[in-house]
From Swiss-Prot:
Coiled coil: none
Name of the protein: Ribosome-recycling factor
Location within or outside the cell: Cytoplasm
Gene responsible for this protein: frr
GO annotation (BP), single: cytoplasmic translational termination
Length: 185
């Protein structure tokens, strides 16, 4: 019973960590990386799909992403989708490939992005702590129903706390890495 609660809590915490990682990927740094376009949606025969499902997305150099559509008619649609996204990018069509140069981030914009990233990290930490609270409540209910002993409850809460500490530390580590990326000129 304790292991089931622990396993459930760990799965939920892992999902929270994955969601935080995806949120971090949406925040662009000064450097180009192909993942930045993963959330840009393109109209493909009536349905919205991510850019990486209708084109090859590659790095041309450290500050430029190349997007090569698999179908020529998609070129203009992809270019428009990138331009209309909230990423602040200005793609340029070069024959069969779209070049997406990454603009330099201003100091003010970097600080704003760091605030956003810290907010996302705090949201992830709160989610992990809520999972801990829910698990501890389950242990208390089991104790009240006399399904487990007080020692089992204490042991379960300690294990959940260790998981909470582990995932919170992982969130902090990811935050520090992203902040360093944002501050790098």
């Amino acid at each position: 019973m304790i292991n089931e609660i622990k396993k459930s809590a760990e799965q939920k915490m892992q999902k929270t960590l994955e969601a935080f990682k995806n949120d971090l990927a949406k925040v662009r740094t000064g450097r180009a990386h192909t993942g930045i376009l993963d959330h840009v949606m393109v109209d493909y025969y009536g349905s919205d799909v991510p850019v990486n499902q209708v084109a090859n997305v590659t790095l041309i150099d450290a500050r430029t992403i190349g997007v090569q559509p698999w179908e020529k008619p998609m070129l203009a649609k992809i270019e428009k989708a990138i331009r209309d996204s909230d990423l602040g990018l200005n793609p340029a069509s070069m024959g069969e490939i779209i070049r997406v140069p990454m603009p330099m981030l201003t100091e003010e914009r970097r600080k704003d992005l760091i605030k956003v990233v810290r907010g996302e990290a705090e949201g992830a930490r709160v989610a992990v702590r809520n999972i801990r609270r829910d698990s501890n409540t389950e242990f208390k209910n089991l104790l009240k129903d006399k399904a487990i002993t007080e020692d089992d409850e204490r042991r379960g809460q300690d294990e959940i706390q260790k998981l909470t500490d582990k995932y919170t530390a992982e969130i902090d580590k990811m935050l520090a890495t992203k902040e360093a990326d944002l501050l790098a000129v």
